[in-house]
């Protein structure tokens, strides 16, 4: 499944923690998950709360690893998310959807 998770920002505190991400849902295909972000479906941006999103392909299991990840940033002109390269602030982090 392809999980959509949004993040307020990418800043880490002194202990290395980020603000808690929010998983909005999942879809059976990447294309459908990407379409949800491209159209800001159900306002996953939440009127300005979330600046970043990640789509992760996660298989079933206990503590599964992300098999694929794509990063997105909110485009204020388009009022929707646009795909972006993996941010430099993200190092060896994964599985935002399930913790």
Spell out what each predicted region is:
Residues 1-23, 49-54:
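Short aromatic-glycine-(Arg/Gly/Cys) micro-motifs in beta-strand/loop hairpins
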Residues 3-6, 33, 94:
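Terminal low-complexity, poorly structured segments
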Residues 15-21, 27-50:
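A short, charged, amphipathic alpha-helix used as a generic interaction element across diverse proteins
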Residues 39-99:
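Short, mixed-charge low-complexity intrinsically disordered segments
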């Amino acid at each position: 499944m392809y999980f959509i998770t949004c993040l307020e920002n990418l800043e880490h505190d002194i202990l290395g923690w980020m603000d808690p991400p929010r998983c909005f849902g999942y879809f059976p295909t990447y294309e459908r998950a990407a379409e949800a972000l491209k159209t800001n479906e159900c306002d996953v941006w939440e009127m300005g709360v979330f600046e970043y999103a990640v789509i992760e392909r996660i298989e079933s299991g206990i503590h599964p690893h992300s098999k694929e990840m794509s990063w997105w940033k909110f485009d204020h002109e388009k009022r929707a998310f646009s795909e972006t390269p993996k941010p430099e602030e993200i190092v060896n982090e994964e599985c935002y959807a399930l913790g």
